[in-house]
Amino acid sequence: MRVPFNDKVWAGRSDDGEAGDTRRVFNQVTPFGSAVRVQHDAPVIVGFSSDEGVRRNQGRIGAAHAPMELRRVLAGLPAKTAMVALADAGDVVCDDGDLEAAQAELADVVSEVLAGGGRPLVLGGGHEVAWGTYSGLRLHQQREAENEATLLISRKLLIINFDAHFDLRQKRPANSGTPFDQIALDCAERGVPFNYACFGISDLSNTASLFAHAERLGVHYVFDVDMQETQLPQRLNELQKLLDAADDVYLTIDLDVLPAATAPGVSAPAALGVPLSVIEAMVLRVRASGKLRVADIAEYNPTLDQDRRTARVAARLAYRLL
């Protein structure tokens, strides 16, 4: 089910009377519709209100409430002077257990945003959001291309996932742990490379079977212990090489990649995790590449959060992607 733009969630304090630019993000938000074209590469928020994939994956539900809560926190951040406007395309809601239909609807919305000149930033929801986001990018490519095969083969898509988990489970029906296996199968069917890089992998959160599957698929991965602050220069160089070899980038951030003290509001908190400063620096590098086409932020669970700490972290990362 699609829920339209809600301007009431975009609200915050007013500093009228103070000198200088006192605007906040909520002052920059406008509604997005399929008939609307935005400034080229302008960010467009899309909500994916779903935790059905988390439920199927035996996780702790609550992430369906995340999109609205993240908007509330994002609304109060300082306006970005370089950003003319921020559009909001509303939410796709999965409230009937039909995850597959919700993912297909999300794909339609993502495709609409791309067709309108925008750059979708999808706020999940569980990490099942990834299949919907990716499908929307592929759908847009299909609709735009006169020759789909030529377009898909000639343009190299890099998928970057900041995550403690591979999310390469092969069990069906699909859930929050299967999206990148679904993507790998889709790439194989299309005859295009599966270029998947996963940063922040925990050796204690993935079975030997998952590591073996990742090896078979040629996944580029880095352990969480190798993504601490002293190793940031090395990781940035590694990331830059991946970016240089790509034409388009899909970035997905699972908040459980962060330490539990930083992001307590997730279904599976990390015992070690990757420092926020490292994730943020790498996100900024991706953003600066000029190749980012779509992005999403997944697994925020407001019902498990403490003092909105995780919400503030997620909003900070979203802000860097605007």
Curated annotation (Swiss-Prot):
Belongs to the arginase family. Binds 2 manganese ions per subunit. This is Formimidoylglutamase. One of its GO terms (molecular function) is agmatinase activity. CDD domains: Formimidoylglutamase (cd09988). Its cofactor is Mn(2+). Mn(2+) 1 binds at residues 127, 163, 167, 254. Mn(2+) 2 binds at residues 163, 165, 254, 256. PANTHER family: ARGINASE/AGMATINASE, FORMIMIDOYLGLUTAMASE. Pathway: Amino-acid degradation; L-histidine degradation into L-glutamate; L-glutamate from N-formimidoyl-L-glutamate (hydrolase route): step 1/1. Its EC number is 3.5.3.8. It is an enzyme of class 3 (hydrolase). It catalyses: N-formimidoyl-L-glutamate + H2O = formamide + L-glutamate.
